[in-house]
Amino acid sequence: RVFDIIAEPIRFHKTASSEKEIAQIVHDLLEHVGLGESASQKYPHEFSGGQRQRISIARALSCRPKILICDEPTSALDVSVQANILNLLKDLQADLGLTMIFISHDLPVIRQMCDRVAVMLHGEICEIEETEKLFKSASHEYSKHLIKLMPRLHSNI
C-alpha cells in the first residue's frame, strides 16, 4: 500500500517516535503532493503515472531532506501532467526551502526549473552558468550545440 511505501523510510531512519506520528507525516505528505489521505490505503497500480510520481515525491520528502535530486522527474509523463509535476516541485521548493538538483535531457524543463545549469560532456562538466545566461550566450561549443537543437515554436503566421 501507498502508506507503507511512504512510511518505510521514516521507520528506517527513525525520524518519527511513534506509529501515530508516522501516520500523521504520511497524511501530511499525501496532502502536500495533492493526493489526499485516502490514497494511503490504495496500491500503486491503482494510480496514473502522474499520481505515482506524486507518491514518489512524497516518499522522497518523508525524511525531510534539504536536497532533493530529481533524475528525469517528468520523462515518462505526458505534457499536461509534466506541467503539473513541475509546478508541484516548484511549490514544494518554495514551501519547504528545498534545494533541488535536476538531471535531465529536457532543456526546456531545465530552463524553467533551474537557477544554474551544469552541462556535462562524456561524464565531465564542461560548463556551469546561470540558466538564462547559458541559454543566451553559452561559451562551450557543446552547450551551444545542445541549445541549438532545442525545439522551438516558429511563428510563420
Spell out what each predicted region is.
Residues 20-38, 147-148:
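Conserved ABC ATPase "signature" region
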Residues 43-47, 51:
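Conserved ABC ATPase signature
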Residues 62-66:
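A short, proline-enriched helix->beta-strand linker immediately N-terminal to the Walker B motif
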Residues 110-112:
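A short, surface-exposed alpha-helical micro-motif characterized by mixed small hydrophobic
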Residues 128-157:
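Short catalytic/signature loops enriched in Gly
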Residues 57, 85:
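Hydrophobic anchor residue at the start of the ABC signature
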